[in-house]
Amino acid sequence: MATVSMRDMLKAGVHFGHQTRYWNPKMKPFIFGARNKVHIINLEKTVPMFNDALAEINKIAARKGKVLFVGTKRAASESVKESAISCDQYYVNNRWLGGMLTNWKTVRQSIKRLKELEIQSADGTFEKLTKKEALMRTREMEKLEKSLGGIKNMGGLPDAMFVIDADHEHIAIKEANNLGIPVFSIVDTNSNPDGVDFVIPGNDDAIRSIQLYTGAVAQTVTEARNQDIVVQAEQDGFVAEA
């Protein structure tokens, strides 16, 4: 299982919070102090909290649970997508559409439409249409892909949600809370930790910090899945004795 050290976090700038005037008092237990009017996060708290979160994600992934990565702001968007794809999981990195989880039935219809359009695009159907109609369908497909592409193969609700920036993604967190889906989130000094099951106090703006978080989660999921495959193979008698 991936673990992250204090050195890794210092190098990535995880300890830099927001300006002191923007702080959320609920984050006080995780703040070490302030420097140049910027809060410094106490990494002695963050390191074990993040590693505890990774241990729990490891358990979920080992039993084939689905992990949804959520990070829609510009700094997080690319890392969230890359990390989710690298471990064969799911992501929302453009805009959280209200009801994405709580109104899954409707979302499923939109995903079905997206897949229909993808088939039409691939099998030459678009070429048989008028230019205008083909353009309209292409635009519809691109729009759906942008908002739902990361969850089109999820096949149901996720078993865990990993979030970058609890404040920015508060709607997603609320939906997960309503459905009893555990929430793992990076929570900066200006954010409200309420509704987050596994709080990870840390910088949620620096790209290097975000890459550290998403990369560690992706590695944890991959290793848990691989371990599960090995165990299954041993049970089925497919692993040769060394």
UniProtKB/Swiss-Prot annotation:
Q: Name one GO molecular function term.
A: structural constituent of ribosome
Keywords associated with the record: Ribonucleoprotein, Ribosomal protein
Q: Which SUPFAM superfamilies match?
A: Ribosomal protein S2
Q: Which domain of life is it from?
A: Bacteria
GO CC terms of this entry: cytosolic small ribosomal subunit
- Pfam families on file: Ribosomal_S2
Q: Which residues form the signal peptide?
A: none
For this entry, list what GO says about its biological process.
translation
Q: Which family does it belong to?
A: Belongs to the universal ribosomal protein uS2 family.
For this protein, the record's NCBIfam families field holds: rpsB_bact
Q: What is this protein called?
A: Small ribosomal subunit protein uS2
